[in-house]
């Protein structure tokens, strides 16, 4: 970014080495307390907030960069608007830490942890929080709806939508903007928080237009002179500086009359660009809005990671989202481990080198989903569509029609946004599109909107779709390789967030399934067989595995999927004294394989373990297939109930849901009526 594109550089850096005591921030109990401060004190408050954020988020992890960039903006909003009457709608919501601090929530010691503050807006925390979903581009539609409701009910007050330039690329934002312009009345303010980035630099035609608005040399030169010369020359100079802001719109039109034309043509009054780190300038712009009776868009220029050198100099994402770090250096505290995303990144690049027809798509998340290495080696074969998952899916269908095999890498919870396109654009047209679904299952600290728990149930409704759930590095590589060979239907490869487990080798392959563990034929209670000590013959059938000592024991088949493979093996071992157990990994969950249906017929019970919804999920699909095939083996399904999960660690959530080895063993014994031999 050119120097002229940045807000004016002032002394704003956070002193992380000593963390001096906070003097003003602890006095802010409600936004009304901000009215007691002059602008010099407000600037000091902004510095204290940045120090607090760096020190606090360094201990818990969270969205640091976005919040460092909106400190002055949030202060100014709370100074001019009244949250007891006006409504703030924060798009995505990851930039609301400052809002929380100013509305009485200053205990960040357990941020994003069980019992602590959410990392996103939360109505349970405060009436000032409205939009909780944390999925981008929805704020303008929400704001439009609230403004319409206010008019119908005769309620006063403004609706303020704060949306980033990245989220502004989403189709929902433009659909809402079209409706707002058509109505063209009401107290509705859109604050376009333009830092040139979402996770990475914002792309597309809108980004180019906003770049043009940022770079107006004459305009920037005039305002910079006013800031440097007038604000430092006492009360008279400040008065003149305010006058300069009063003439700002005219000055802008004189030096660059095309600015804001895109929004003006839509019927939205455009103001800006405004320095998002100048509280006085922001307050002046917001105050002018109060006299309007029609929607207004204020274009605010901010700097992601502002005031914290490690974030400012981190080119990849300016500390968009971090784990625990050393606040003085920004270096991570926890050692890095090889993660699922890195395996995907390595394997898709390997496959692309062998097949030039493989192309990749992302929705503004090139680095988080692991496509950056692909982009570096094959820049013409990666397409970033912005925050527009539905567009990505339909674009993938077009690429498939054109003879390529698109791989769309996306977070599981964001795949929900492209369901219609998956169904009608990809599946209906038998398009060979592979979806690599990162962060599937319970993710934890980011709360209800980020758990990737809906995908299997949704995907099960799509005709022809095939879905795989790898259990470790080797199976991720294998199943991704199998997926890109399918050229007449959509495929999904789902994998969780975080570090890889140790390798989980199979005893053998039976049809399409991997056998992971089984009670050996004729064994005494508690004996077991693992791949590392296996002497089982390849191709052994369920009938062959029965021994004289095991025939009397009830037969239990455990289908443990993906990240729950090791859990299934632990459960199987614990039940080996009471059941003749086999633990399998189905590998491909959808459609349910005929091999699994046939195998189920030879068992007294089938247990399914899945890191997804129980209702409509893998277990439900097995139950349906068995019924269709006149196989009446009972199916006991374990997974995530149909509810929104509060933020906590993944382990805490799984324990609460009873998805631990001990809890599952007790439940299976209870539901089957088979008591433990040791307890008998």
Where are the predicted features?
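Non-catalytic terminal/interface segments that mediate subunit docking, oligomerization
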Residues: 87, 302-304, 308-415, 421-431, ...
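N-terminal amphipathic, basic-rich helices that act as targeting or association modules
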Residues: 2-102, 264-265, 275-282, 299
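Long, well-ordered, tryptophan-enriched scaffold segments
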Residues: 15-19, 196-344
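Cofactor-binding active-site loop characterized by glycine-rich and histidine/acidic residues
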Residues: 63-183, 357-358, 362-363, 371-372
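Structural signature of the thiamine diphosphate
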Residues: 237-311, 432-437, 456-506, 661-680
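A glycine-rich helix N-cap at a beta->alpha junction
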Residues: 107-117, 182-195, 427-439
């Amino acid at each position: 970014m050119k120097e002229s594109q940045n807000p004016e550089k002032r002394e704003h850096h956070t002193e992380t080495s000593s963390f001096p005591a906070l003097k003003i921030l602890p006095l802010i109990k409600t936004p009304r307390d901000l009215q007691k401060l002059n602008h010099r004190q407000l600037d000091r408050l902004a510095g204290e907030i940045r120090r607090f954020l760096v020190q606090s988020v360094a201990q818990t992890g969270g969205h640091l960069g976005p919040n460092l960039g909106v400190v002055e903006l949030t202060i100014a909003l709370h100074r001019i608007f009244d949250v007891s009457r006006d409504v703030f709608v924060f798009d995505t919501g990851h930039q609301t830490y400052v809002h929380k601090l100013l509305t009485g929530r200053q205990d960040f010691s357990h941020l994003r942890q069980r019992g602590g503050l959410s990392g996103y807006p939360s109505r349970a925390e405060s009436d000032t929080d409205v939009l909780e979903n944390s999925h981008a581009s929805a704020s303008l539609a929400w704001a439009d709806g609230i403004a319409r409701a206010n008019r119908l009910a005769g309620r006063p007050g403004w609706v303020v939508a704060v949306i980033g330039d990245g989220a502004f690329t989403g189709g929902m934002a433009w659909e809402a903007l079209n409706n707002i312009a058509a109505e063209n009345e009401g107290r509705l303010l859109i604050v376009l928080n333009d830092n040139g980035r979402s996770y990475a630099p914002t792309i597309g035609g809108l980004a180019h237009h906003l770049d043009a608005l940022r770079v107006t040399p004459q305009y920037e030169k005039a305002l910079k002179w006013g800031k440097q010369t007038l604000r430092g020359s006492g009360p008279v100079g400040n008065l003149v500086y305010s006058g300069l802001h009063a003439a700002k719109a005219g000055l802008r039109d004189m030096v660059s009359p095309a600015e804001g034309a895109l929004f003006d043509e839509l019927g939205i009054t455009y103001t800006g660009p405004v320095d998002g780190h100048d509280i006085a300038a922001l307050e002046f712009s917001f105050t002018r809005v109060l006299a309007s009776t029609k929607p207004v868009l204020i274009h605010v220029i901010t700097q992601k990671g502002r005031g914290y050198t490690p974030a400012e100099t981190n080119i990849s994402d300016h500390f968009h989202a971090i784990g625990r770090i050393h606040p003085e250096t920004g270096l991570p505290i926890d050692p890095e481990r090889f993660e699922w995303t890195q395996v995907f990144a390595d394997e898709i690049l390997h496959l692309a080198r062998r097949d030039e027809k493989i192309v990749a798509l992302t929705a503004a998340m090139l680095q988080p989903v692991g496509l950056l290495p692909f982009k570096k080696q094959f820049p013409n074969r990666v397409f970033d569509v912005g925050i527009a998952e539905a567009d990505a899916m339909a674009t993938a269908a077009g690429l498939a029609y054109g003879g390529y095999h698109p791989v769309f890498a996306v977070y599981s919870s964001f795949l929900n946004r492209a369901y219609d396109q998956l169904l009608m654009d990809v599946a209906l047209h038998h398009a060979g599109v592979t979806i690599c679904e990162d962060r599937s299952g319970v993710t934890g600290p980011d709360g209800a909107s980020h758990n990737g728990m809906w995908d299997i149930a949704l995907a099960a409704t799509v005709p022809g779709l095939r879905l795989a759930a790898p259990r470790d590095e080797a199976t991720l590589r294998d199943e991704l390789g199998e997926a890109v060979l399918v050229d007449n239907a959509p495929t999904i490869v789902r994998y969780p967030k975080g570090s890889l487990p140790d390798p989980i080798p199979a005893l053998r392959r039976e049809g399409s399934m991997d056998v992971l563990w089984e009670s050996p034929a004729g064994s005494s209670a508690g004996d077991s067989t693992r791949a590392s000590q296996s002497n089982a013959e390849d191709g052994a059938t369920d009938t062959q595995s029965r021994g004289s000592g095991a025939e009397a024991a009830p037969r239990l088949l455990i289908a443990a999927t993906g990240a729950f493979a090791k859990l299934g093996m632990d459960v199987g071992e614990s039940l080996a004294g009471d059941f003749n157990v086999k633990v399998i990994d189905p590998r491909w969950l959808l459609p349910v394989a005929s091999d699994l249906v046939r195998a189920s017929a030879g068992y007294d019970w089938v247990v399914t373990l899945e890191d997804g919804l129980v209702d409509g999920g893998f277990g439900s699909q097995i139950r349906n297939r068995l019924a269709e095939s006149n196989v009446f083996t009972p199916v006991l399904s374990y997974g995530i109930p149909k509810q929104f999960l509060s933020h906590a660690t993944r382990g805490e959530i799984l324990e609460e849901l009873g998805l631990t080895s001990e809890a599952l063993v007790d439940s299976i014994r209870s539901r089957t009526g088979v008591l433990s031999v040791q307890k008998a």
